Amino acid sequence: MKKNLLLIFASLLVMSCSSGDDDIMDNVDDNDDNNINLFSNKAKVVGYFPYYRFSLNNQIEYCKVTHLNIAFANPVADGTIVLPSTDNTTLADVVNRARSQNSNIKIYISLAGGALSSTTADIWKNFLANSQERPKLIDKIVQFTKENNLDGVDVDL
């Protein structure tokens, strides 16, 4: 009986993941060599680009993604958002190159995610648990997003 219930549940889950209205093949252009219009309202290609791989910036084909998430930034004690750097390639270099190759690309900063140090985890906890500190963090996130010409934020807590 349990196996039958599990099978029924799994079948329903799989069927619910597919709706006839969102068929990606609706975006096929028979005259296009790539066949699928990546910039339709239906198809999304999201790439995560970790800061420690910024040295590969010149090898990335940004024209093949619709959304780029820069991973991972975190706040320091005063709420300032910091993206670590490991080489000479900056966030501005990545954003500028991505936008020069793909004017439709949406670029987001991914916050938290990955393996947080205990210090960074404590900073997040402090801001999230304290209703008076939370607005400071939000202001710093908005400031970082605007200063770096980003389109939004991906929170990966």
Segments from the language model and where they lie:
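Sec-dependent N-terminal signal peptides
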Residues: 6-9
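Glycan-recognition patch characteristic of GH18 chitinases/ENGases
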Residues: 27-145
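Active-site groove signature of glycoside hydrolases
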Residues: 140-157
